Amino acid sequence: MRLFSHLAVLAILACAVPITAIPSFLSNSYPAHPAEGISLFPQTQPQAPLGLWTRLRNTVIERLWRVPPQLCKNRPGHKGKFPLFSAPASLRARYGDDVVLRFTIRNAEEVKALAEASNILFLDVWASTDEWVDIRLSKDVVPSLLGLLPKSLQTSHIPLIHDLPQTIYESYPSSSQRSSYDVQGFSPSTKHSSDKTNIFFQDYQPFSVIVPWMRLLTSMFSSHVQMINIGSTFEGRDIPALQIGVWPANNPKPRKTVVVSGGSHAREWISVSTVNYVAYSLITNYAKSKHVAELLQQFDFIFIPTLNPDGYIYTWEVDRIWRKNRQDTSLPFCPGVDLDRTWGFKWDGNITADNPCSESYPGEDPFAGIEAKQFSQWAKNQTAQNNTEFVAFIDLHSYSQQIRYPYSYSCQPDPPNLENLEELAIGIAKAIRLTNRETYEVSSACEGLMASQAKVKSDDPFPRIERTGGSALDWFYHDLNVKYSYQIKLRDRGSYGFLLPRENIVPTGQEMFNAVMVLGRFLSGHDGFGPLDWEDESQRPKADEDDIPSENELDENDDSWIPYDYRNHDDQNEGEGYDNDEWGFRRRRKR
């Protein structure tokens, strides 16, 4: 049976063109008729004749799924104009004419059709919410995809990224910035650094820079920082982490510990930078902020910039959009396991275990992903042998700006401490919004990965676009009994997707630093969320004077730009500012 599955995968791959992704800077829109869909992406010259495999693929789709021929074949006579590309030829060769489309979903039939078509064509689903789904694919595949979808979806989509190679090219650090790094070096200061001085967060950093930076922090702040190793990767690299806290001597009680992890999916660079930013902010503010000092005296914080160093390095050196780790699978040309689908709790790999080419491939068995297994063993050893009590787990991802709590595998049953999970999640969302005005939606993880029929007043959920069993979120919550476990999807909402510009690194880091402060104050029991120390420059949003409205421009009820003091929270009406202030909180529809 396994051999038959592999042969089936090989046959389908032989009939499919390589699938890449969508970037865009064009202002085109799809025509109303689905047969004209491909003309959305204009060209400077007539298209070259279709290759043998592309024509074979189109023929297979036409025959098996009865797709009209005009939807499966490019029209070589079509002419248009293409913008000039500055991306290197190597990027153009790898990503070709890949695009990212956003489909608006309205009912269960549309979701099911989109999920089935994505599986048939081996498409890369970038993100999904209860309103839309972003899919990366080659322009050659667009007609085939539309032909597999109902008519309602053939016209309810827009292009998000038209030119993936160019967008990828612009996401890498510029040569001028790299030269400035070589001259100035990375020197954390005991005083709060300006953006110009703290150049580490002016751009994304490769793994070869992150590790020495972590060592430097450890040597400079040895009183409250240690560098530890979580385990080893498939390719033999260490998985480094920073342990931050003030360890009391001869304390028999278990040490309460918060884990913040990023980079499980290699292409989500903003999660790596954000973990580093939050760690750096706690480290450098220990001697300046009494609230930070209190937290580090009560809790240990473990910051893991990337659980997937092999994959992260691969995104820098080979494929910027790579998602999985780099371990071998049963198919030599389809390496990698999805490190957020391979955990042991409610692992549902029986559905996708025979397809190593899937972006969500969970491996052949629970904990088949080496890095996830190493992480779980480290966590168990900490609780069993090192007097550690894990009280919170935050798993940073991108994108879509969502705060998700358990469970991911299913919306039934509810987690036992649902109300507390929701309360803290709302507080985190509020802290984020009051930092830089960004809105994060709060929901259970199962709802965040499917569409809901709230708009049509039904309690029945839509089918899922992606399988969600075997997540780190559920494992930490259920198997390790970490009561406050969250998965946070960072910026943005799809304009750039995984290729978020470097200008978002510091603002996103500020938002998550304040989120961690709220988490810590909540766990400390300081009157709910406790006060945020807005006197610390690291917690205040850095807005230009032109961005701050004058008094006559401010609505007396609009405090979104003003640093929020949680000490005054009890003076407000209970619940004020949550649902009424449109913070994106969606309560569970079924209790």
UniProtKB/Swiss-Prot annotation:
Binding residue positions for Zn(2+): 265, 268, 397
Region (Disordered): 533-591
Chain positions carrying an annotated carbohydrate: 350, 381, 386
Compartments where located: Vacuole; Secreted
Propeptide: 22-175
UniProt binding sites for substrate: 265-268, 323, 340-341, 398-399
Keyword entries, A-Z: Cell wall biogenesis/degradation, Disulfide bond, Glycoprotein, Metal-binding, Secreted, Signal, Vacuole, Zinc
GO molecular function: zinc ion binding
Disulphide linkage map: 334-357
Record function comment: Inactive carboxypeptidase that may play a role in cell wall organization and biogenesis.
PANTHER family: INACTIVE METALLOCARBOXYPEPTIDASE ECM14 (PTHR11705:SF147), PROTEASE FAMILY M14 CARBOXYPEPTIDASE A,B (PTHR11705)
Family: Belongs to the peptidase M14 family.
Official protein name in the record: Inactive metallocarboxypeptidase ECM14
The organism of origin for this protein: Paracoccidioides brasiliensis (strain Pb18)
Lineage: Eukaryota, Fungi, Dikarya, Ascomycota, Pezizomycotina
